[in-house]
Amino acid sequence: MSLNDNFVYMPPQGELSILYEDDDLVIIEKPAGLLSVPGRLPEHHDSAYYRVLEQFPNAKITHRLDMATSGILMFAKYRDAEVAVSKMFQARTVKKNYIALVQGKLPDTGRIEVPLITDWENRPRQIVHFELGKQALTLYEHLEYDEAKDVSRVLLTPITGRSHQL
């Protein structure tokens, strides 16, 4: 039995907020709980990508966020813009940051460096595997600590781009 056997996809309803638009790009706010791209099963087709296609039929997604992650998604309106953005991601000129809440109090700064591999029984989850995993590096900066809840707010900066590395 895998962790996904009882999963029921219930994406948030409502229109996506457009944060920015120009001749080449449209940037939206993806809510937590919505897939960035459609899943394999028909009941997993509702996604930010398909919702954006309703307004921008030629749109191409330039990157993805995990379903549980809320944040900014960028879409290229045309193939030329998609190629240009893809080159920026490959050259690592695009900087990605995430804010997360984690249990406990962390040092002011740090790095999380572990080798990750797909947990095939529980896809899309990743597991740490020191022999077969691919190195994943995330830098963090401690922003705030809530002593009552024992929770830290941290700024995460992934250096590598492994799936589900955060």
PLM segments and residue spans:
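RNA pseudouridine synthases
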Residues: M1-Q165
